[in-house]
Amino acid sequence: MPPIEPAERPKLTLKNVIGDLVALIQNVLFNPDFSVFVAPLLWLADSIVIKVIIGTVSYTDIDFSSYMQQIFKIRQGELDYSNIFGDTGPLVYPAGHVHAYSVLSWYSDGGEDVSFVQQAFGWLYLGCLLLSISSYFFSGLGKIPPVYFVLLVASKRLHSIFVLRLFNDCLTTFLMLATIIILQQASYWRKDGTTIPFILSLIAADTYSLAISVKMNALLYLPAFLLLIYLICDENLIKALAPVLVLILVQVGVGYSFILPLHYDDQANEIRSAYFRQAFDFSRQFLYKWTVNWRFLSQETFNNVHFHQLLFALHIITLVLFILKFLSPKNIGKPLGRFVLDIFKFWKPTLSPTNIINDPERSPDFVYTVMATTNLIGVLFARSLHYQFLSWYAFSLPYLLYKARLNFIASIIVYAAHEYCWLVFPATEQSSALLVSILLLILILIFTNEQLFPSQSVPAEKKNT
């Protein structure tokens, strides 16, 4: 047998070097096998970016000082929400917001040490990023290309919302991301029985309730949360009521000082009434000058109650359509009619063995997509979006672009156009119309995706062609 001659090494030429660099860049951006290396490096790089922003960009006080003024009144003993004001208006957030900013007030000398608060929000941002990266990996099981992780850290506006504005939306976002990953874990561990998933569903109800207690926008997730809890609890309605009870009890516990459940005198009734009236005011009016999404409409239309009713109707209709898609027979393992009838067998589990929630490979993806899509529907039909509201869905946007089956280049273009909409200040007719169009496009592409929850054996490049 003749000896095997070693292959000739490629020559060190400029052309070969450039070719190697191009191949490396392509792998770093588009090869899913590189995501496990790229994502941690992005997190570390973004932690440096956060420090640079805090150290070089001036903090802008929009609501934070008003939050501190409101907290000061509460610390003086005022519990009646109708008497708690700051420079920008009355206190309109639930008790979780009060507790969170009370802690910040305590450690920042009443808000005077803004640098400390910025650092706290910097860590909060990095926590959100870490949870998002973990959820992405868990959902895609290593199949998501690195470019979508790059998009996770690419929003200038999102960085500003966290460390230069200090809005309470940031804490709600963190708690919702925590809730999602706990639900993902609950679905995954069904492969080993039902006890661990049930315990995790109770923990998820806890974090979800805490998110609601900070800001009401977390309620946009409620339909998805209830659906997933029902599935994780074996389609046993009695069992699923336990997480719902936890959710309610946490609300009572967090808001105890204002709800005063054991007191029924006139003063307690007034404090309780003011709390629910202001902290959970669904009829709150928004200012036209701050709207990011409906600027292409006239101010008269924006303030018209019939327009608000239309948005609510479209929200419900779209939500129902997506729920029907999520509950397709191939996902739940039985006809939809049987699923509905089984709800009335509330005393026993009726979950099909072939339900997607029982598939540890696909259920984390199902959980994330159902939660993120339901939230995005609420965002699309919101009566108004202010600049800080970007944080409501920014961390899920790259994943939703991935689920929309856009190719890499299209995803980058859509993301850049979306970021442009949030950077324009004040919003214009063009930027707001573009924003609504982008959100609508993403939802349409997800809805028309016939392979929304493919087997993980399907190569990633097949999903995005």
Swiss-Prot record:
Organism lineage: Eukaryota, Fungi, Dikarya, Ascomycota, Saccharomycotina
Q: Does the keyword Oxidoreductase apply?
A: no
EC number(s) given by UniProt: 2.4.1.258
Q: What is this protein called?
A: Dol-P-Man:Man(5)GlcNAc(2)-PP-Dol alpha-1,3-mannosyltransferase
Identify the enzyme class: transferase
Q: Name any one Pfam family assigned in the record.
A: ALG3
The entry's cellular-component GO terms read:
endoplasmic reticulum membrane
- Reaction catalyzed: an alpha-D-Man-(1->2)-alpha-D-Man-(1->2)-alpha-D-Man-(1->3)-[alpha-D-Man-(1->6)]-beta-D-Man-(1->4)-beta-D-GlcNAc-(1->4)-alpha-D-GlcNAc-diphospho-di-trans,poly-cis-dolichol + a di-trans,poly-cis-dolichyl beta-D-mannosyl phosphate = an alpha-D-Man-(1->2)-alpha-D-Man-(1->2)-alpha-D-Man-(1->3)-[alpha-D-Man-(1->3)-alpha-D-Man-(1->6)]-beta-D-Man-(1->4)-beta-D-GlcNAc-(1->4)-alpha-D-GlcNAc-diphospho-di-trans,poly-cis-dolichol + a di-trans,poly-cis-dolichyl phosphate + H(+)
Q: Which UniProt keywords apply?
A: Endoplasmic reticulum, Glycosyltransferase, Membrane, Transferase, Transmembrane, Transmembrane helix
Keyword Glycosyltransferase among UniProt keywords: yes
Residues on the membrane's Lumenal side span: 1-33, 105-120, 182-211, 261-306, 386-407, 454-465
| Gene Ontology molecular function, alphabetical | dol-P-Man:Man(5)GlcNAc(2)-PP-Dol alpha-1,3-mannosyltransferase activity
Annotated membrane topology is:
Multi-pass membrane protein
**Family of this protein:** Belongs to the glycosyltransferase ALG3 family.
List locations, semicolon-separated. Answer: Endoplasmic reticulum membrane
Q: Where are the transmembrane segments?
A: 34-54, 84-104, 121-141, 161-181, 212-232, 240-260, 307-327, 366-385, 408-428, 433-453
Q: In which pathway does it act?
A: Protein modification; protein glycosylation
Q: Which residues lie on this side of the membrane: Cytoplasmic?
A: 55-83, 142-160, 233-239, 328-365, 429-432
Q: Which GO terms describe its biological process?
A: dolichol-linked oligosaccharide biosynthetic process
Where does it primarily localize? endoplasmic reticulum
Name its species: Komagataella phaffii (strain GS115 / ATCC 20864) (Yeast)
Function description: Dol-P-Man:Man(5)GlcNAc(2)-PP-Dol alpha-1,3-mannosyltransferase that operates in the biosynthetic pathway of dolichol-linked oligosaccharides, the glycan precursors employed in protein asparagine (N)-glycosylation. The assembly of dolichol-linked oligosaccharides begins on the cytosolic side of the endoplasmic reticulum membrane and finishes in its lumen. The sequential addition of sugars to dolichol pyrophosphate produces dolichol-linked oligosaccharides containing fourteen sugars, including two GlcNAcs, nine mannoses and three glucoses.
Tell me which domain of life the UniProt entry assigns to the organism this sequence originates from: Eukaryota
